[in-house]
Each structure stands twice: as structure tokens, then as C-alpha cells.
Amino acid sequence: MFFHAILVLIQVALALGASPRAGSSERSKYFVTSLPGMYSNLPKEEIPIMFSGQLELFPENNTHYYFWKFVNPNPIAEAERRTIFWLNGGPGCSSMDGALMEAGPFRVNDDKEIVYNNGSWHKAGDIVFVDQPAGTGFSYSDEYEHELPDVSVHFLKFLEKYFEVFPEDRQNQIFFAGESYAGQYIPYIADGILKRNKNLKAGESPYDLRGLLIGNGWIAPNEQSLSYVQYALQAGFVSPSMPGWSRLLASQERCQNVVNSVNTQDDSVSDYKVVSDVCDQVLNTLLEVARDRDAPADQQCVNMYDYTLRDEFPSCGMNWPPDLVNVKPFLNIPGVQSQLNLVHKKPWLECSGRVGRNFVAQRSKPAVHLLPSLLEDVPILLFNGNRDIICNYIGTEAFIKELEWNGQKGWDDDNVFDWNFDGNLAGYVRNSRNLTFVNVFNSSHMVPFDLPDTSRSLMDLVTGNFDIKDDKILTYKLGTRGQAKQSDKKPASTSSIPSEISATALASGSSSASAQASATANEADGDNNTSHKIERAIQLLVIIVLLWGIYALYSSYKSRPSSIIKSGPTGKKKNVQWADQLRRFQEDDQVRVQPHGIFAKALNKFKGNSDGAYAPVQGRYEDIEMSSASPIDDFVVVSDDEEEEPSRNEPSSNQK
């Protein structure tokens, strides 16, 4: 065990010594060297280099964003010089869902220890999970964000601070990935980056933004709400013969009237904000109509995040995914919070009710309005798990059909291409003019939760790391593309594929800003390398001496005679308490503790009230990343520092 730990420390030391620029000493306080189960459950070669902590953004209002960065110590060539920023949704749901249940290298077992996720995205590039807006997860502030433009401004500030700590990442290709309400966050952040790149201040260099990946995104909420009835009929869990069918159609018609009155291409802010309460009600009505009152109590409602699963009514998916019952207590272990370098320790809640209630998005236009301008410069990949109801693939394809970008409306043609991953059919792909859509088969609202290895290959579709054969798009397990027989494969090229399905089309960063970013960053990097050789050598020498000293001390300790009378442990027992583990959407006011050709169905949606949060069904359903918002009266403040956590079936204002 000791030598295992030393090996990890050496890997971290080499990572530091590789580029001792200005940020190196600063970032040392963010190292993560141990977590429960790390040395006993993970192969030593799979232990990532990790950095974690709370970065100060605005001292005037005490705003700090929490991040957890994972680096592959042995990266393959195709994954080098990449940084992926991952965001979960809500608003107000922690990206630790993504880190510990989806795209990160760890899962949490029943013993509250980490185990390895073989499909981790950190093998496709360094990945950084960020809790935002302020107040989400381990992030904190004295003030809350209210609008989507705030998200953009504050995240650009986070990037500024992040690159001060990790200057070697500044030249990397940047990708954003996330799901659910991140379908609003990511376009706004990308828009802010592109505007920054075009208006650089003295001494600034552009960020090399290369692609956006949005899974089960809540991008055009009202238009997507119109897909529920069609999806449910196709999936077979409702029919016109059901009681309440006419009520469902009436709800659908009211939403259609809203959509007809709002031009999604209109650049002005809609009276309906990001989502209309009228359209928000369609899903609530659908789940009520689909309820099977003759089934056992825990099987009466279809799971809104995976229609093949059942749940109790009115939860309808709030008790999913099952991993959450381990993730929450794990992140609330005091020792784990210390190992993650939390200066301001706080109870971890999956979703913050206070953030959701404050994030009203009342003056924000839906992110779908930003896609046309973004697609002029940046490739965007939208992917949907085909079993998701709340943000289903039918709704995504419907708003794309009505979208006008790069001089044309909708897709160039009707061609659909099968996507094969590792020799098996994984879904289908459509692509035109920098926009790619992927329907991922056999997956839910959280695609990486169900199919981690397959989901990681979505990065290959964005970066052009694929082949074409018989009008099929072929991707492979990490690093194995070169092993495939090339004689019977056609390389991805514009001329070989209709509908612009090609490596060039999918991976192109057509923006001159991206090219400029690469050139500028590389030039700056070249100037730094020579001047730091001596510093690197000295730093590595010091690290080696320190490690040798630790080894010598350990050897001396092991070799000395031991007494037959051994003292027992004297450490204090730490008592940790947390609320009902199945509660999906809890109030984060508890946070202010001590300073602390084939069809399927898919995608998750966030529900919202007049305050801008997406509410659960009947005002009582909590969405994983889009729960419904309850009236403020539902949240009773017990004290200035702690807000009462609602019981499992009470309404909540957050989603994941």
C-alpha cells in the first residue's frame, strides 16, 4: 500500500515538474492524493492525477466555484492537449453527478468507497467538473445568479482564475459537455467565449474552443414539450383509450398555442422566459394519465428519465439513478471533503432549492436562439438517450427541423447514418453545416450512466476520430482505431459521405478564432519551454529527495523492534448525519452550516415555475436535472443558517 501511494505521488510530481510555470506553486494546494478505496479498489495504472478545490471568483461577494479535475497520467496521443469542462443542469444541480455517476473515472460502492469506471471521459482529454451557478454543490457565494447571461460572465471569470492556476491548459483545445439544463448553460458560455475572442484586451490570448456536446439538452423548452404525446404513443405507455386522454390533448393544444405565438428565431426576449408554465404542464398531465393504479405502489408511474423503468407515484423517477444513495453520503464524509481540499465545508446536496428559486431566467432568451451564431464558428453535437421522456429525442429533432443556421433551415437532406461503436449498432447520426445529432440507443436521460464507454466515443464524432464504411459511421474503443483493418474502410472525407458526414465536417472549428488561439498559444508555449528547463530539473530533484526521505523514514520505522504492548487508535470518531438518501431535490439552505431507420425514445426535461425553475410533475415531481419548482411557501426556513429539507414526496424547485 505504501509503495502504491508513493507511485501516485511520483505521477503527481512528474505532472508538476513537467511545466513549473506561474501556476505550479498555486495549484499544489489543489492536489488530491487519497480517497476512500483509491489504493485498494483501483488498478494503480488507472489512478488519475487529480486537482480539486474552491476557486475565488469575486472577493466582494465571496463567490467561489468548486472544480474537480481529472488527468490521465498516461494519455494516448489523440487525447493530448484537450480540456473538457463538464456541467450538469438544474438549475442548481451539482456536476458531482457527472463526476461520480457519469463521465468521471469513479463510481461509489455500497461501502462508500470509489471503484473504477472503465468508460471515464478523462481518457479522451483532461476533464474538469464544475459546480455552478454559485451555491450549487460545493460552490458558494453571498449572492445568487438570476439570468443566463450571468452564467456566461461568471464562468468566463472562472476560466480566467482556472488558467491562472493551470497556465499549461490555456493552450489546450477546449470542449464543453453536459446534459439537461446545461443545454441552456453551455450555449451561453460558448457565446461569451467567442465574443471574448473577438474583443481581446492587451495581454490576452483567445481560448481555443473546439466543440460543444450537449446530452438530453433542454434547449428549446416549449418546442420540446410538444413532443411528449408523440413520444408516449410511440413508446406505448399511453393510448387514446385511456381515461384522461382528452385532458392530455387539451394540455398539448394549449402548449401549441404558446409555441405558435413565439417565433423561436426572434432575437427578442420572450414573454414566456425560458419555458412557459403552460407547456411545462404537458409532462405533468402525461404522467398522471399514464399512471397504472392497478400496479404495485412502487410500479404505478413510468420513470420520466427512462420509460422502461417504473417508480412510485408521484415520484415518477425521483428515486433514480440508484447510485445517488451512495454518492450523497460519500461526499458528506468530513474526511472526503478535506481530501477534496474544501476550505469552506458544507453539506453536499445534489440539487439546491435556493439556487433554483433565485435563477428565474426571466430576462433570458432560450439558448436555442444562440445556436445559429455559434454554429458559424463551433461544431455542436446534440445527443439523446432514446429512453428519456423528459428531454426526448423527438423534441430535439423537432426543434432542429425548424432551426435556421448557416444559410439554410433544417437538415440538408433526409439521410440518416447508422453509428457503430466497437462493432455494435449504437445509434444513428445526422449532420449538416457544423451541427450533429446522435440518437444513442439503449440509454436514458443520463447517457454516460448507462453507457460510459459508448458515450466517451461521442468525443470521437466531434474530433473526427472515426471511419466510414457502407454509409456507417464507425468508432472504436479508446486507442484501438489504428488496430482496425484499414483495407476495407473508407477514411472520413467530405467527398465520400453525403450530407456532410465527415471528419472535416464534424471536427471542423470553422472559426478563425480557433486557429488564432492555437497559433498564439503554441508560440507562447515555445517561449516558455527553454527558460524553465533548469527550474524543472531543480523541482524534480527536490521531489525525488523528499520521496527518498519518506521511504527511508518508513524503512527505519518498519525495521525497529516493536513492543508487545500496542497502543490503540486515539482518533476521535466523526459522526456524520445526512437526510433521506432517496431525496432527490433538497434545499441547499442546509448548506449554510459552519463556514463551511430505427426509432426509440429519449431525453430529460426540466420543469419550471414562474420563478424560472423547472418543476416536478403536478408541482410535486423532482427532475434529476429539471425538477419542478414549488411555491416559495413550500420551503420553510427554520433558521438563518438552515432550511428544512422537504420530505421525499414534497415539491422541490430543482432539477439535475
Curated annotation (Swiss-Prot):
Which residues are named in the active-site annotation?
S180, D388, H445
In short, the EC number is 3.4.16.6
Q: Kindly report every residue range on the membrane side named Lumenal.
A: 18-536
Judged by the first EC level, this protein's enzyme class is hydrolase
Q: Provide the membrane topology annotation.
A: Single-pass type I membrane protein
Q: What keyword terms does UniProt attach to this protein?
A: Apoptosis, Carboxypeptidase, Glycoprotein, Golgi apparatus, Hydrolase, Membrane, Protease, Signal, Transmembrane, Transmembrane helix
The UniProt family comment states:
Belongs to the peptidase S10 family.
**Function, in words:** Protease with a carboxypeptidase B-like function involved in the C-terminal processing of the lysine and arginine residues from protein precursors. Promotes cell fusion and is involved in the programmed cell death.
In Swiss-Prot or TrEMBL terms, this protein is called: Pheromone-processing carboxypeptidase KEX1
Species, as recorded: Meyerozyma guilliermondii (strain ATCC 6260 / CBS 566 / DSM 6381 / JCM 1539 / NBRC 10279 / NRRL Y-324) (Yeast)
